């Protein structure tokens, strides 16, 4: 197994790439990981914890070889907005949940979550689940990646309970505007379901 122990500091000279390592977002948050290159070589990552690897990052192995990181396709939820105002609203509310977000041209992408997907639909966005590379914004959230001794899912779970409560509050606040009713109970699986009922005026 090839041991990869440090990030490569780029110089003016273009490095020779020995291999490409494709990793999902949760895998890129981990400092210790066994993986394979796209050509099938076994590699082990032994890196400083707490810094999420980004698509295109270069790493150096103990033998001096340079490897590049590629964001692997994974299941994601992509929400498409119809106009800039709608887009700004959903970015604001999703941002309040401290969830990793990839932001595009009037679309946002996040890890699958029924609560967040329902919230996007509540604001009128079209939501689809698809397979695509996930490259969230590397802002303040990046400093929280990978707590010591936790699995790669710890960062996502940390804000999940909070998103449930926030979604219930949002549903109540928006019920008059969008004619949605939010039930006071929770279903066994813990997700809030927003039921729309037609109103006569």
From Swiss-Prot:
InterPro entries: UreE (IPR012406), UreE_C_dom (IPR007864), UreE_N (IPR004029), UreE_N_sf (IPR036118). Keywords: Chaperone, Cytoplasm, Nickel, Nickel insertion. Residues 136-173, 182-201 are annotated as: Disordered. Its main location: cytoplasm. It is found in: Cytoplasm. GO terms for cellular component: cytoplasm. Involved in urease metallocenter assembly. Binds nickel. Probably functions as a nickel donor during metallocenter assembly. NCBIfam families: PRK13261.1-1. Belongs to the UreE family. This is Urease accessory protein UreE.
């Amino acid at each position: 197994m090839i041991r990869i122990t440090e990030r490569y500091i780029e110089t003016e000279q273009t490095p020779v790439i020995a291999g490409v390592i494709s990793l999902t977002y949760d895998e890129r948050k981990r400092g210790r990981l066994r993986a394979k290159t796209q050509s099938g070589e076994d590699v082990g990552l032994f890196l400083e914890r707490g810094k999420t690897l980004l698509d295109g990052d270069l790493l150096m192995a103990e033998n001096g070889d340079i490897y590049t990181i590629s964001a692997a396709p994974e299941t994601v939820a992509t929400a498409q907005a119809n106009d800039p105002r709608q887009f700004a609203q959903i970015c604001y509310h999703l941002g309040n949940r401290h969830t990793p977000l990839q932001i595009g041209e009037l679309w946002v992408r996040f890890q699958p979550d029924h609560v967040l997907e329902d919230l996007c639909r509540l604001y009128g966005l079209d939501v689809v689940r698809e397979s695509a590379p996930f490259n969230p914004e590397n802002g303040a959230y990046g400093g929280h990646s990978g707590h010591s001794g936790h699995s790669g899912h710890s960062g996502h779970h940390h804000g999940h309970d909070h998103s449930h409560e926030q979604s219930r509050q949002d549903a109540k606040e928006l019920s008059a505007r969008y004619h949605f009713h939010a039930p006071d109970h929770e279903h066994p699986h813990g997700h809030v379901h927003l039921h729309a009922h037609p109103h006569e005026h």
